């Protein structure tokens, strides 16, 4: 008799980037009265909530350092490993860099799940590292009450081409490289409401490496770049706006989304992170419908890149996207700050 399939999501209270501590609570945790250590070679720290730290090692080269880890968002161990690795490596691409090495972070409930299952998880992470052209060079593990996997990733970038989330300019168009709705579809699967024709869509979206980010870095007109993960599109766009001193207009109908997300929202397939996200930054957003809120605040795991692009660089961005098999269209634009308007406004 065959043993029953393992459902990893049943062993964790959270899922993927939806496990993130909310922005509001995180602000309290990170607040400090201590004087910060100043290092002139640290080009990007945590002041602007960027995707990774960047350190200038000289000769125009910066070292990128980042880490990301979470609990299972899918049941299959190998796919969990793939998704966790893709998500962690993405932060390097979001800074405009190329990954060169990774080490694993593993928490495993050894009294509940066999080590052979953890091996499959690590194999999934190793597979993605090979796709990215890097070694999974080591790691650290602990006995934990819930399964956790992530990577600490090192990358390199030209110091002239670092893409921060705080350098966007008014007049930039906004582009998004992956569709929204990952949290919604994975919640539908967890609730056994996912239709057969939609199985695997979210997983394959999450497993797409954000490699184009390393190529977008060569375009000066890409003024800011970040990846859309646990805080949802509105959360990560608000970080760009606040860091850059600009405001945004989003065209809801132009935003790419996974199939049938509106139907799944109507069926109650909304992750808990959506509400926590809105509670943290909803006061910054203009009027929007409940449906728009559920999609735009949906926590993404291993989501796409969000780019702010000057008008004269749009063609270059679209050309690079085409080389990677993507077709990109603007989903909104950035405007000068105006206290009479919301930080982000949603139009049809």
UniProtKB/Swiss-Prot annotation:
The keyword Nuclease does not apply. The keyword Magnesium applies. The record marks 20 as: Important for catalytic activity. Belongs to the selenophosphate synthase 1 family. Class I subfamily. Homodimer. GO terms for molecular function: ATP binding; magnesium ion binding; selenide, water dikinase activity. It comes from the Bacteria. It holds the Pfam family AIRS_C. ATP binds at residues 20, 48-50, 68, 91, 139-141. GO terms for biological process: selenocysteine biosynthetic process. This is Selenide, water dikinase. Keywords: ATP-binding, Kinase, Magnesium, Metal-binding, Nucleotide-binding, Selenium, Transferase. It comes from Yersinia pestis. One of its GO terms (cellular component) is cytoplasm. Gene3D superfamilies: PurM-like C-terminal domain (3.90.650.10), PurM-like, N-terminal domain (3.30.1330.10). Synthesizes selenophosphate from selenide and ATP. It catalyses: hydrogenselenide + ATP + H2O = selenophosphate + AMP + phosphate + 2 H(+). The active site is at 17. PANTHER family: INACTIVE SELENIDE, WATER DIKINASE-LIKE PROTEIN-RELATED (PTHR10256:SF0), SELENIDE, WATER DIKINASE (PTHR10256). Its EC number is 2.7.9.3. Binds 1 Mg(2+) ion per monomer. Its cofactor is Mg(2+). Mg(2+) binds at residues 51, 91, 227.
